[in-house]
Amino acid sequence: MSLLRNFFSFTFSANSIITKPYFAIPIKAMEATSELNLNYPKPISAPPPPISKDIELRRAMEASSKSSLFNLTRDDILYEDEYLMAVNKPKGVYCEAVLRSAPQIVLDSSSEYHLANRLDRDTSGVMIITKSHKVAAKLVKAFTEHKIRKSYIALCIGSSPNWRRVTVSSGHGRSKHGAWRVYAALDVGRVLPGGSFVRDMETTFEVVSVNSVKNESCELEDVNHVIVAEGERELSCGGDDDDVVVVVRAFPRSGRTHQIRLHCQYLGIPIRGDVKYHGVYEWNGRTFEGHELHAECLSLDHPVTGDSIVIRAPLPYWAAGD
């Protein structure tokens, strides 16, 4: 197993727009000394840049307005039977709006519809809605026990990776200011400000393409497993160019909040539009409202029949060519 430590941040002014990622100075320069004095574990990913707050607030308001008017259509349904349905959640809509409209599209007045999985506001793709409390409990248990296989696809702007496939294990938790951060794997179980604990998270990444060049044509190496820990950074990037378009496929083993987004930030390939985690907001003359992350596939055993099910959502425009 390799040891990996990587720091990423952005330079910005009060009125700047995020246009490209930068390698960072050590995170300890950004942390308040009081947190260190209390012996809390130190996050090893950069905090959200100040400019992201206003952008995220505006996006949230726009999503609330859009969600209030949202209704599922038959074209959004990817799979359905008497126990559950899978839908293709659009970008920029809250999960609750999708759940609210589900009974209407199937002409069912039942109040037992539940979200089996949740997607971030700007993440699109496969979302499962159960039709009874009993089925919901079974699927939640399956997700918790990592029995459901998930794959996502993301478009990132950052430094060209020199790896083809890598599994990243780290800690996950909220820093004292409430932001989700990456922590060292050795910190799992330690107490955080506010009384929560560092929890484990693990994601496997595969490079799909770099600047539209397919994986098979890239001169990349397989890296078996990287444990995020204190120590020298052994998983390096392929060059000094920090404006490379990298499409990756992600397979999260755990299901932590913002997990893929955090690990992409940590690896130096933040997701395009993901300003909270240092993704570019403006790039090549365009602005991007929301991050480019799509839940493309869920594979599971049916909670009632036991049949194997593979549910795929159509790829968004930015991934369709990959």
Curated annotation (Swiss-Prot):
Class of the enzyme per the UniProt entry, highest EC level: isomerase
Database matches in Pfam families: PseudoU_synth_2
GO-annotated molecular function: pseudouridine synthase activity; RNA binding
A Gene Ontology biological process term: pseudouridine synthesis
Catalytic activity line of the entry: a uridine in RNA = a pseudouridine in RNA
InterPro entries in alphabetical order: PsdUridine_synth_cat_dom_sf (IPR020103), PsdUridine_synth_RluA-like_CS (IPR006224), PsdUridine_synth_RsuA/RluA (IPR006145), RluA_PseudoU_synthase (IPR050188)
UniProt-listed PROSITE patterns: PSI_RLU
Keyword set, alphabetical order: Isomerase, RNA-binding
Cross-referenced PANTHER family: MITOCHONDRIAL RNA PSEUDOURIDINE SYNTHASE, RNA PSEUDOURIDINE SYNTHASE 1
Family to which the UniProt record says this protein belongs: Belongs to the pseudouridine synthase RluA family.
Protein name as annotated: RNA pseudouridine synthase 1
Organism the protein comes from: Arabidopsis thaliana (Mouse-ear cress)
Organism ancestry: Eukaryota, Viridiplantae, Streptophyta, Embryophyta, Tracheophyta
